[in-house]
Design a protein with these regions (language model features):
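Feature captures the catalytic ectodomains and active-site-proximal regions of enzymes
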Residues: 2-405
Length: 405
């Protein structure tokens, strides 16, 4: 049987253009402007990236600009490169909420119809009674608070009594702070695992261990924070990739966010630069599959603390490292840069903000300069990944693969 010459050429080109490896880099909280429903979340006027740039009277991000970030609708204060090396767009969050899990799960193809619950007035009595019974410990706090402020407020009493500090925020989190000399780190993690089981029926997004050190008046949180997340409520593209034998490497808090599901390797990090280092190491070790990295410092160290200057410096640091990642790419690689929500350090709020997120896509053999527009869901990333690795169509999202091949 003869095959049409045109079809042969098409099949040959498809094989030549095949993508074998994807680096998905999440700049945690780098939002680019309020979503249409931001008012419902009290986030009117938020624009994390543009406001940070304005707050420091301009910012030089040449490598992100070269990929096209300045061309994205809603981004102000960055150069609009006429011929960018990448393609660009922005994404709207279809899920309800603005949590870390919500954003990451949606990237992986899972849309939440109901937001994860929050507790602005503290956790209900039945949760805290179970906490006391199951851990054998009384507690301090049980209110919404800034992590650094509640340690200042209750740290000394915690040292005197040995009671862990329980608090929450505007996000779906059950946070437990303890001095490392009072409650050793492994014991704190054990307490968090117990709390995770207690709050599972309530679908609280994360239990977070928040260890700190130092003396009263100079307490300092350590890098040994650990997240214990609710498992995704349905199948994600990570699950599908793993089941098909593809390497799925989670770097940073990705393993925690996905309840340690759908990953073939988990690599924890100390900070943004360590996250970039670990991403580079993973690129050197494997030539296929997904490398999924979260750089959390933007959110944890600067967004939540309303530190616009620190946020700007962190953006510059990551921008300087992008060439180190790109120079390791071969012709079958794709680079996706995005975010999971906003956390505008220039607004009175210290919490996440409901914002669009950037979408930058680059590859040696991919089209450049394509305006991918406003995507209706973060799940477009998951659908694109599913199409690339031929793991079946996801229930949510629209692939942008045909636009850039």
């Amino acid at each position: 049987m003869l095959i049409d010459a045109g079809k042969l050429e098409f099949l040959f080109r498809m094989e030549q253009d095949k993508i074998n490896r994807i680096v998905l880099l999440v700049l945690d909280s780098v939002g680019i402007g309020e979503l249409p429903d931001a008012r419902d979340y009290h986030d009117e006027g938020s624009n994390t990236l543009s406001h940070v740039i304005k707050a420091v009277s301009g910012l030089d991000l040449p490598n992100l600009e070269a990929l096209g970030i300045g061309l994205i609708e809603g981004v102000e204060g960055l150069k609009k490169i006429r011929r960018p090396k990448g393609s660009f767009g922005r994404m709207l969050e279809a899920s309800k909420g603005k949590d870390t899990e919500t954003g990451h799960w949606e990237m992986a193809g899972l849309i939440l119809e109901k937001p994860l619950p929050t507790y602005p007035h503290g956790f209900p009595k039945e949760i805290m009674e179970s906490f006391k019974k199951e851990t054998g410990l009384d507690y301090l706090g049980n209110k919404a608070a800034s992590g650094t402020e509640i340690i200042k407020e209750l740290g000394e009493e915690h040292i005197k009594t040995g009671k862990p500090i329980v608090y929450t925020s505007a996000d779906s989190v059950f946070q437990i702070a303890a001095h490392e000399e009072i409650i050793p780190i492994e014991r704190l993690y054990e307490i968090c695992r117990i709390a995770r089981k207690i709050v599972d029926p309530y679908h609280i997004g994360r239990v977070i261990a928040r260890p700190f050190i130092g003396a009263s008046g100079s307490f300092k949180r350590t890098e040994r924070r650990k997240d214990f997340s609710l498992s995704p409520t349905d199948e994600t593209v990570l699950d599908r990739l793993k089941s098909k034998g593809q390497p799925v490497v989670g770097i940073g808090k990705i393993g925690d966010i996905f309840g340690h599901r759908g990953l073939t390797e988990e690599i924890h990090t100390k900070d943004n630069m360590d996250g970039v280092d670990k991403t580079i190491d993973a690129l050197k070790r494997s030539e296929q599959g997904l490398i999924f990295t979260n750089l959390v410092d933007f959110d944890m160290l600067y967004g939540h603390r309303n530190d616009a200057r620190g946020y700007a410096e962190a953006l510059s640091e990551v921008d300087r490292r992008i060439p180190e990642i790109v120079e390791l790419f071969n012709d079958s690689d794709m680079f996706i840069i995005t975010a999971d929500h906003g956390c505008d350090p220039t607004t009175p709020s210290t919490d996440h903000s409901r914002e669009y997120v950037p979408l930058l896509v680059y590859g040696n053999k991919l089209k450049s300069g394509i305006d991918l527009g406003t995507r209706k869901s973060f799940a477009d990333i998951g659908q694109t990944i599913a199409e690339i690795f031929n793991v079946g169509k996801m229930p949510n999202g629209k692939s942008f693969l045909n636009s850039i091949l």
